[in-house]
Amino acid sequence: MGRLSTHVLDTAKGRPAAGVRIMLYRISGQNHRKVKEVVTNADGRTDAPMLEGAALEAGVYELVFCAGDYLRASGQAGEGVLFLDEIPIRFGVPDADQHYHVPLLISPFGYSTYRGS
């Protein structure tokens, strides 16, 4: 049974990023269908997988992390326009029976991601 999970770490503060809103979209051509919206818990994780079992299908997905709201709330944003606000990560799921973990490591001026385990 496959599943999709994520978590967010604040690399500037060296701790999990709690309270980050995340939207998951299924991408099909020009169509973007919102599948789920969650907020990270105190551990920077979601309380349940983003998708699992039959809900996870092979295809293209996009996670959109609302980093700007988090950076403002955590006192890491100055006045005016942020360098990073919404961070989209588009990725493919070739085999819906596998586990796909897509973490986000953020700071006010950079981010990184990878396929985790």
For the regions a language model picked out, list residue spans one by one.
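Beta-strand-dominated extracellular/periplasmic modules and repeats
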Residues: 2-94, 101-103
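Compositionally biased low-complexity segments at domain edges in trafficked proteins
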Residues: 94-117
